[in-house]
């Protein structure tokens, strides 16, 4: 007998409120055929590769920290195109349109030769090598060694009109019922998102964690990151950003391999399960009495990675990149007339060794006690951009989206909403500065707040470095050739009459 039964599955209904749709910039931005070239000066920095060298009182930094394993976060300032002296003022109507810049291409130039720089720690928490052991040995109260290694090889850059967002693991707050019982226990972890600032450290093979908080012994990582937070760009959140301002596009190349295999010194926090937790003989069989293996060794294994070969065949820098289609809704429009370029590159990681004598006179014999060794690291950058002039119509639906995205843009365009005055009649005193009248009202002028003032960037001002002569610059010539804007000279054909030869008579 056939019976009809109702469907037992769940029925999914669409949401009742309308979902706000964010328009792509291509839907309301009109691009012109006017392109500008912008190029920075040669940007140089010199410092110590591991830490800041401070004065004796510790209040003043005498030599800054400049490492090849740091991020370089450039904040490039461009002129306001609405206040720009255009060659053709009929390009737009200021009563119905506003001008913005669009990034059409860029090139990140890097100077200095390729090189591998090592890092390390004079008291590195390395009990011993665990790859090739000849005997089973236990640890002592202090097994730290002077160890160095080369970091993971990283080449990366992120381009957007707001700072790049990074992610790292940090200590999480402890629940209230467990706050009094945390001594000797591993703290809870949480993933945090922060802005990648200039000078933040790159992950060099030990993970993107806050070493300042999570490395109590100050010996688990190298000197350059032991008191720092290693960050990694949060590509997932930037790719899913509703406006797509943080990352128009990015390029990334990372490589590493495990070169050495070590084990940490100290007690194991999470011991190998044994009979004390009802897991006897499930992970290992105990050794006989009297054997060295009777006391189980440390199981906190870790590798020191290596970036391996550094070659000019795999360079992301000193070559142009053209932006045709961004990954988000913002297709290269530079809101706020600024562009953020976040760079990480440790393929030019050579550290200079500089030696000086501590004696004033002439030195005739070598004595290491009279010689001081210094470390310095240098970096060289140059940024070049191709900027396209674009127009935005002052329509209600366009202004509504821009106001929801960033109301400061409309204020910069002098399109702020003026509130209705509460009282049309005000009191105006003559001789307001005299002693016969009341004190003048102190009206504090409200300055425009910089939303990124609390962050550290390498500021690059290009407000006076724009040019229409693209063919006068290397990146401009590449752009002209790539986009087919080059005017080819016409070939002039001339007809030349060749006199006919005289026929010879046969004899």
Swiss-Prot record:
Pfam families: Late_protein_L1. Residues 120-147 are annotated as: Disordered. Keywords: Capsid protein, Disulfide bond, Host nucleus, Host-virus interaction, Late protein, T=7 icosahedral capsid protein, Viral attachment to host cell, Viral penetration into host cytoplasm, Virion, Virus endocytosis by host, Virus entry into host cell. GO terms for molecular function: structural molecule activity. Coiled coil: none annotated. The keyword Disulfide bond applies. GO terms for cellular component: host cell nucleus; T=7 icosahedral viral capsid. It is found in: Virion; Host nucleus. Residues 132-147 have a biased composition (Polar residues). The keyword Disulfide bond applies. Signal peptide: none annotated. One of its GO terms (biological process) is endocytosis involved in viral entry into host cell. HAMAP family: PPV_L1. Self-assembles into homopentamers. The capsid has an icosahedral symmetry and consists of 72 capsomers, with each capsomer being a pentamer of L1. Interacts with the minor capsid protein L2; this interaction is necessary for viral genome encapsidation. Interacts with protein E2; this interaction enhances E2-dependent replication and transcription activation. Belongs to the papillomaviridae L1 protein family. Forms an icosahedral capsid with a T=7 symmetry and a 50 nm diameter. The capsid is composed of 72 pentamers linked to each other by disulfide bonds and associated with L2 proteins. Binds to heparan sulfate proteoglycans on cell surface of basal layer keratinocytes to provide initial virion attachment. This binding mediates a conformational change in the virus capsid that facilitates efficient infection. The virion enters the host cell via endocytosis. During virus trafficking, L1 protein dissociates from the viral DNA and the genomic DNA is released to the host nucleus. This is Major capsid protein L1.
């Amino acid at each position: 007998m056939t019976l009809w039964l109702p469907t037992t599955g769940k029925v999914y209904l669409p949401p009742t409120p309308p979902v706000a749709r964010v328009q792509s910039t291509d839907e309301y931005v009109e691009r012109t055929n006017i392109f500008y070239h912008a190029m920075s000066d040669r940007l140089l920095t010199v410092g110590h590769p591991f830490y800041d060298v401070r004065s004796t009182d510790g209040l003043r930094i005498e030599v800054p920290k400049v490492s090849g394993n740091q991020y370089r976060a450039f904040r490039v300032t461009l002129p306001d195109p609405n206040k720009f002296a255009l060659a053709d003022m009929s390009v737009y109507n200021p009563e119905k349109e506003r001008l913005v810049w669009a990034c059409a291409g860029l090139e990140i130039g890097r100077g200095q030769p390729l090189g591998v720089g090592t890092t390390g720690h004079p008291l590195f928490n390395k009990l011993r090598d665990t790859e090739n052991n000849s005997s089973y040995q236990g640890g002592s109260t202090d097994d730290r060694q002077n160890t160095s290694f080369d970091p993971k090889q990283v080449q990366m850059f992120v381009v957007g009109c707001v700072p790049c967002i990074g992610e790292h693991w940090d200590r999480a707050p402890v629940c209230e019922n467990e706050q009094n019982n945390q001594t000797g226990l591993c703290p809870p972890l949480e993933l945090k998102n922060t802005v990648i600032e200039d000078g933040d450290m790159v992950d060099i093979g030990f993970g993107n964690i806050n070493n300042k908080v999570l490395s109590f012994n100050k010996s688990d990582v190298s000197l350059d990151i032991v008191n720092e937070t290693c960050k990694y760009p949060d590509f997932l959140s930037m790719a899913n950003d509703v406006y797509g301002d943080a990352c128009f596009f990015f390029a990334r190349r990372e490589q590493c391999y495990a070169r050495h295999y070590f084990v940490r010194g100290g007690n194991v926090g999470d011991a190998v399960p044994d009979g004390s937790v009802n897991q006897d003989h499930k992970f290992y069989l105990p050794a006989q009495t009297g054997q060295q293996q009777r006391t189980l060794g440390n199981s906190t294994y870790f590798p020191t990675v290596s970036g391996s070969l550094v070659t000019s065949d795999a360079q992301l820098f000193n070559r142009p990149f053209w932006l045709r289609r961004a990954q988000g809704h913002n297709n290269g429009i530079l809101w706020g007339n600024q562009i953020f370029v976040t760079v990480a590159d440790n393929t030019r990681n050579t550290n200079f060794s500089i030696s000086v004598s501590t004696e004033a006179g002439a030195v005739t014999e070598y004595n290491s006690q009279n010689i001081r060794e210094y470390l310095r690291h240098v970096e060289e950058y140059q940024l070049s951009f191709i900027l396209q002039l674009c127009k935005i119509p002052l329509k209600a639906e366009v202004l509504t989206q821009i106001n929801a995205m960033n109301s400061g843009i409309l204020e910069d365009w002098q399109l702020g909403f003026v509130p209705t005055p509460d009282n049309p009649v005000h009191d105006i005193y003559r001789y307001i500065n005299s002693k016969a009248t009341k004190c003048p009202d102190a009206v504090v002028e409200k300055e425009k707040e910089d939303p990124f003032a609390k962050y550290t960037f390498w500021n690059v001002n290009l407000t006076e470095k724009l040019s229409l002569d693209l063919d006068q610059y290397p990146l401009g010539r590449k752009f002209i050739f790539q986009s087919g804007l080059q005017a080819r000279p016409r070939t002039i054909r001339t007809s030349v009459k060749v006199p006919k030869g005289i026929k010879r008579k046969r004899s």
